[in-house]
């Protein structure tokens, strides 16, 4: 399955000057919501991701995603794996588990995002779950921006990667684009970064 073509065909690979949720600036932006608006394609992508995870023979009892961006990807992945799905969300800028969702002690959970950039949101989600007694066994995403080390990828983890090196990150593809700190972004000389994502900075 050609993941990059899926993003291009869905007009989900945007070019311009963007402020990413990680705080970095980039000339490209992946808008996974455009890919996931097609239920059939969302199902196919999740099945591809589930296949990778199943081949690793991990015991996964639940998938959890940080809202909002990860919810559709996480739900479809949970469906493909045949496990339950929950999500965390921000309340006063703090990641929280609400809506009656509960986790059992030592419940084995995979944290799923639509896109992993630095993994900061995924780690905030994981921390909430671990504080409630869950065991994080892996991370997953449709796309990886190439900062975090992906299972089955030749790319190494880069500076700024937040995910722990001892847990696997499953993703369908690496999308490696130039990213800049706002203080040294060359794009800022000619334009202002726009924020098309799902959360503020």
Curated annotation (Swiss-Prot):
Residues the record lists as binding 5-phospho-alpha-D-ribose 1-diphosphate: 113-121
Binding locations of orotate: 117, 145
Cofactor: Mg(2+)
Broad enzyme group: transferase
UniProt pathway annotation: Pyrimidine metabolism; UMP biosynthesis via de novo pathway; UMP from orotate: step 1/2
InterPro entries: OPRT, Orotate_PRibTrfase_bac, PRibTrfase_dom, PRTase-like
An example molecular function term from Gene Ontology annotations: magnesium ion binding
Swiss-Prot/TrEMBL catalytic activity: orotidine 5'-phosphate + diphosphate = orotate + 5-phospho-alpha-D-ribose 1-diphosphate
UniProtKB keywords: Glycosyltransferase, Magnesium, Pyrimidine biosynthesis, Transferase
Function per UniProt: Catalyzes the transfer of a ribosyl phosphate group from 5-phosphoribose 1-diphosphate to orotate, leading to the formation of orotidine monophosphate (OMP).
Complex formation: Homodimer.
PANTHER family according to UniProt: OROTATE PHOSPHORIBOSYLTRANSFERASE, URIDINE 5'-MONOPHOSPHATE SYNTHASE
Name recorded for this polypeptide: Orotate phosphoribosyltransferase
């Amino acid at each position: 399955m050609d993941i990059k073509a899926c993003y291009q065909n869905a007009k989900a690979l945007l070019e311009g000057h963007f402020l990413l949720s990680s705080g970095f600036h980039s000339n490209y932006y992946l808008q996974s919501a455009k890919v996931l608006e097609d239920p059939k394609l969302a199902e196919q992508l999740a099945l591809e991701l589930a296949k990778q995870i199943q081949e690793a023979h991990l015991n996964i009892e639940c998938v959890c995603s940080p809202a909002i961006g990860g919810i559709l990807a996480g739900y479809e992945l949970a469906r493909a794996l045949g496990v339950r799905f929950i999500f965390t969300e921000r309340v006063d800028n703090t990641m929280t588990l609400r809506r009656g969702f509960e986790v059992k002690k030592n419940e084995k959970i995979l944290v799923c995002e639509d896109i992993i950039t630095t993994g900061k949101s995924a780690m905030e989600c994981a921390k909430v779950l671990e504080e409630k007694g869950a065991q994080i066994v892996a991370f997953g995403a449709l796309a990886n921006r190439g900062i975090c080390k992906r299972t089955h990828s030749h790319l190494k983890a880069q500076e700024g990667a937040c995910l722990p090196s001892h847990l696997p990150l499953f993703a369908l593809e690496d999308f490696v684009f130039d990213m800049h700190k706002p203080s040294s972004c060359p794009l800022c000389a000619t334009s202002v970064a726009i924020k098309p994502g799902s959360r503020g900075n």
